[in-house]
């Protein structure tokens, strides 16, 4: 599809050069179509385009994380300060139901969460949807036992989320030590990441990116 789109754009562009005043307009439209078509091959990130608060970010990498209380779709509550009293890290995974890349990485995230359940708390936050039954069914249909948090829209602006899935790690010192936009599509990456944050050698906050795991 991408090859056909680019060839079509080239042919129309050549034709438009002979069309006088319509050339610029048509070329502009074709360029937009090409950009859209060629970008469709990147299937690891589903980008949210209609959020008006993307620029109102509160938190960034290296910041101290505030204390928040969240409630999952089953009525269980999770407070960051209480979690960090018994865990070595909190992982926030932002997703939404129709996000293909989110579904792609969930098995890897679930496996890592199960392996490091004693040391790491993983919360799956859906900031765009508060439909409890749909979220519960999604978890059941995808064999997921992670705590699913519904409809926390303020997180979009709090972290200036620009795509889904987004994974953020709050380390044992309460600092944001990791942030990644896009699906983790290789087995073992989440486990390597979790191993880093639970290690006894983790003596102070260290900000890392996905390529370091």
Predicted regions and their residues:
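Short, internal strand/loop/helix patches
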Residues: 136-173, 181
